[in-house]
Design a protein with these regions (language model features):
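Alpha-helical transmembrane segments in multipass membrane proteins, preferentially the mid-helix core
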Residues: 143-154, 219-222, 274-290, 336-341
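Terminal transmembrane helical module of multi-pass membrane proteins
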Residues: 4, 291-354
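Short aromatic-rich membrane-water interface segments that cap or initiate transmembrane helices
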Residues: 60-64, 194-208, 335
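A loop-to-helix transmembrane entry motif
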Residues: 203-210, 260-274
Length: 354
């Protein structure tokens, strides 16, 4: 029988340095291991090998959430730098650096909110329980490791569609956390912006969430329209402008509080809806290649927002309900828009290659 080596050359082994995906996966695993070791080591002097509560001040949940946030932010920055060294894509200006910083912060906050919520749920499941010394080290290290791993892979695979998901996750998590920790339990009887009018940590978190989310929308707009296929002359610029306006107005909602700058706050909130409406109505003219089946989705969302606003004016619905539904519809549309643009881009590239 002929030895396997003599039957054919077989597939050539690719050197590790040329296996980019494998290298990135190994790097993510290495960063996760590093985060585990560092966070577990820091937990030694923090908890002094003593038991700790699951959630609340001085708890393993609080420590793990903060450590995971730092690990996620640093890992995301490391992932973008890894792509930068491979010129895929290369950061070429201040805006690119600011984009990376904002996205790293968003990943850190998502990790912070996620682990805080997980700890709160576990505390409700195990009422009165404490975590022993060694599990404290293991749990906190594991939380940081998982967060670093996910954030690094998110950074190296970041695209318009994933960025839209990150934006939605960040915005929903921030608003939900503010609502759960609001000093006024009846805030919803007034409007959503009431979450940002007090001086407590919950209000600051709400306003910061809106500002960062607004900036992320502008980042998303730049990324999504950079190579928008089949856009007419000037269409790409107009789509970019409309999305940027949505982001800027969203950030301004967090900057100008409803209790101190009512008219400015109302103007920018209304402007966000107007910009969204213009974009959905004019999208077909600006991007002729966009799916015809997608266009009625935007029109329907806009019609629902207008009807809800009319119901609020007539006294049937509260402003909170209108704001929540409008926010969900706008950002759902943005996510769907990114997916349709991605599909259009792929089809255009396939058609050009054929």
């Amino acid at each position: 029988m002929t030895p396997p080596a003599e039957q054919g050359a077989g597939p050539a082994r690719v050197p590790l340095r040329e296996r980019e995906n494998t290298t990135l996966e190994l790097t993510a695993t290495g960063l996760a291991a590093l985060a585990f070791v560092v966070v577990a080591a820091v937990a030694l002097p923090v908890f002094r090998l003593e038991a700790a509560p699951i959630s609340g001040p001085g708890s393993v949940g609080q420590y793990a959430a903060v450590a995971a946030a730092v690990a996620a932010a640093l890992a995301f920055a490391a992932g973008r730098y890894a792509l930068h060294t491979r010129s895929r894509p290369r950061m070429g200006g201040v805006l690119d650096v600011v984009d990376v910083a904002a996205l790293a912060l968003a990943h850190g906050i998502i990790a912070l909110l996620g682990w805080t919520l997980a700890a709160a749920i576990m505390a409700e499941a195990f009422i009165g329980a404490t975590v022993f010394a060694l599990p404290v080290l293991a749990v906190s290290g594991a939380a940081a490791a998982v967060s670093a791993y996910i954030a690094f892979l998110s950074a190296v695979n970041m695209g318009p569609q994933l960025l839209a998901v990150v934006l939605a996750t960040f915005l929903v998590g921030g608003v939900l956390a503010s609502a759960l920790t609001a000093s006024d339990p009846e805030w919803w009887m007034q409007n959503l912006s009431t979450l940002g009018i007090s001086d407590d940590l919950s209000a600051r978190a709400f306003n910061i969430t809106l500002v960062i989310a607004g900036f992320l929308v502008t980042v998303l707009a730049r990324v999504a329209t950079r190579e928008l296929p089949t856009a007419t002359a000037g269409g790409q610029r107009r789509v970019l402008g409309a999305l940027v306006l949505v982001g800027v107005f969203l950030g301004c909602v967090g900057i100008f509080n409803v209790d101190t700058r009512f008219w400015i706050h109302t103007a920018v909130a209304s402007g966000m809806v107007v910009a969204f409406g213009v974009l959905t109505i004019r999208l077909r003219a600006w991007v002729p290649g966009i799916s015809r089946a997608f266009l009625p989705v935007g029109w329907a969302f806009l019609a629902i927002i207008v009807v809800l606003a009319a119901f609020f004016a007539a006294g049937y619905y509260s402003l909170t309900a209108v704001e929540l539904v409008a926010g969900v519809l706008v950002f759902t549309w943005i996510i769907l828009f990114q997916r349709n643009v991605g599909a259009l881009d792929a089809d255009t590239a396939r058609g050009g290659a054929a």
